[in-house]
Amino acid sequence: PENYIQRVIQFAKQGFKEIEFKTYDTDWDSEAYLTVSGQNSNNSIRVTNEFLEKVEKNEDWNLLRRTDGKVFKTLKAKDLWSKITEAAWSCADPGLQYDSTINEWHTCPKEEKINASNPCSEYMFIDDTACNLASLNLIKFSLGDKSFNVDAFEYACRLWTLTLEISVMMAQFPSKEIAQKSFDYRTLGLGYANIGGLLMSWGVPYDSNEGRSICASITAIMTGISYATSAEIAKELGAFSKYKINSKDMLRVIKNHKRAAEGFEDGYDSLTINPVPLIKEDCSITELPKAASLAWKKAYELGSKYGFRNAQTTVIAPTGTIGLVMDCDTTGIEPDFAMVKFKKLAGGGYFKIINQVVPQALKNLDYDINQINDIKQYVLGSGSLKNCQSVSHSALKDKGFEKEQLDLIENSLESAFDIKFVFNQFTLGEDFCKNILKISDTQLNDFSFDMLNFLGFTKEEIDAANIHVCGSMTLEGAPHLKD
């Protein structure tokens, strides 16, 4: 690391000839994790339209002191933008919030500006407010054959909007101010998870016009139905207490949403940058954009008549924790980050799982059951050296392995990341390694010692055995794949 290099240079200048550096391992309970700062924080920065315009023109941007508002430093906006994007690409921080756009879509601008969000950045509203979250697992509304149960999804959105509205009265907040303002604005946090899993199960690429259109349609249905339900509740119980002074702005925002759901590229009210509209032609499931348009038409009509019970109704949270409990393959709006996951168990050990929608996706892409099983084994591996052509049982017997050692190896392979981690003195026993395999103490205690290589297996043979046992961890290169 760069800081270590600088330390060495400084020590050398001071005349030090020997420097001792502390080393760490990667165990999740080790000291190494304690040295990594920022583990319990999410870092986001806000950029305005003015900043983005200066990036385009390669103009100067002033950094201001928070204490007195005076200029601290002036630099090129484009250079700062490059640093921000490189940092976000390499470590996912900082997150970006587009301040001008956020406040142009603010439903209650007469009160306060939206200054910040919650840590995960899905909830954008005024200071000292909060919302309760609820997420729907989208794959539960799939009918399995690239069709979506719109009626059931709309019903679930209505039901959960009502449930979250009730929860405003029951929620416990960390301060009096947050409790009061959350009661006044009654913001809700309905969202969804597993859009990546849903698209994959249908064989639709996540990064495609079709995938984006399906996602946009489902999102528009959820938010439109939720606002329409909020207006229905307002008819019975009244609008939220701050609605009257914000009604004109809120209806403007709802109308802009409606226009986007209807697919218009222009005609928006008080927006500097128009949204990307819903492109109906890209959506292969024709009832989705139709339902989205109707949902927002209903939301605007009912809201114009009765107002809204809630200042906001939906968010899309990362669902990193609840998504696992909900049996989701992917969290929030994200794609799947890997075909295979190793889940570490708190009691020790691991288990390996493949994304459970992969077989369904292959079926929808017209692969037969035998092809699907072959592809699954290629990805996950067999968890055994049986039928392996390179590091086989017979080859190991020729090296001195008996049934006892082969059984020990087999019992350890199922959860192994790499077969080399199984071939060690802790699995096979120190006596066997020394007396039968003739491995020295120095070699056994060397962390980099490769027993399979010592036994005479080539790199190609070891790699082939690894794929056979542990899998390739990816679909790339799998048998039977079509172009």
Predicted regions and their residues:
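Long, C-terminal-biased catalytic regions of enzyme "large/alpha" subunits
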Residues: 1-483
